[in-house]
């Protein structure tokens, strides 16, 4: 798995940095899949993931409001769906650490690569059309 800055650049330093941080958390989850991890270590990474993803979504939604992105409501619903999916995995797989880390890793990777490439790129396109003429 590699981090491709061109795919997920938002033309916003804060959001781009957060994407990199989420990528690093995804790497931690991936490494946890390859070895036995204790619940204490897992809780630290889960806390880091939830804090970062909520902070990122909040900052990204503020950016969308700032640029008056017309599809903010749709994009915000996608953010809520991602958070709910993460929370459901944590609840449903609480007793199965390896399954939980594997599923969470897939969701986070999907968010980082697919969501940013598909949905966040729409924000970038809107921003560039509106402000970089």
Curated annotation (Swiss-Prot):
Matches recorded under InterPro entries: Bacteriohemerythrin-like, Haemerythrin_Fe_BS, Hemerythrin, Hemerythrin-like, Hemerythrin-like_sf, Hemerythrin_metal-bd
UniProt keyword Chaperone, yes or no: no
Keywords: Iron, Metal-binding, Oxygen transport, Transport
Signal peptide positions on this chain: none
Subunit and partners: Monomer.
Similarity remark: Belongs to the hemerythrin family.
Residues bound to Fe cation 1: 19, 56, 60, 120
Record keyword Metal-binding present: yes
Pfam family, one: Hemerythrin
Stated name of the protein: Bacteriohemerythrin
SUPFAM superfamilies: Hemerythrin-like
Protein function: Oxygen-binding protein. May be involved in a storage mechanism or for delivery to oxygen-requiring enzymes. The oxygen-binding site contains two iron atoms.
Cited PANTHER family: BACTERIOHEMERYTHRIN
CDD domains: Hemerythrin
Protein's organism: Campylobacter jejuni subsp. jejuni serotype O:2 (strain ATCC 700819 / NCTC 11168)
Chain residues that bind Fe cation 2: 60, 75, 79, 115, 120
Any GO molecular function: iron ion binding
């Amino acid at each position: 798995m590699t981090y491709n800055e061109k795919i997920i650049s938002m033309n916003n330093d804060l959001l781009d940095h957060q994407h990199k941080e989420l990528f690093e958390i995804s790497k931690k989850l991936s490494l946890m899949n390859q070895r036995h991890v204790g619940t204490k270590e897992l809780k630290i990474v889960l806390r880091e993931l939830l804090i970062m993803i909520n902070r990122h979504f909040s900052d990204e939604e503020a950016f969308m409001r700032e640029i008056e992105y017309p599809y903010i409501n749709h994009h915000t619903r996608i953010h809520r769906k991602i958070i709910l999916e993460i929370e459901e995995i944590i609840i449903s797989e609480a007793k199965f650490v390896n399954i939980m880390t594997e599923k969470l890793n897939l969701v986070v990777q999907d968010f980082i690569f697919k969501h940013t490439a598909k949905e966040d790129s729409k924000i970038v396109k809107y921003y560039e059309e509106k402000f970089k003429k």
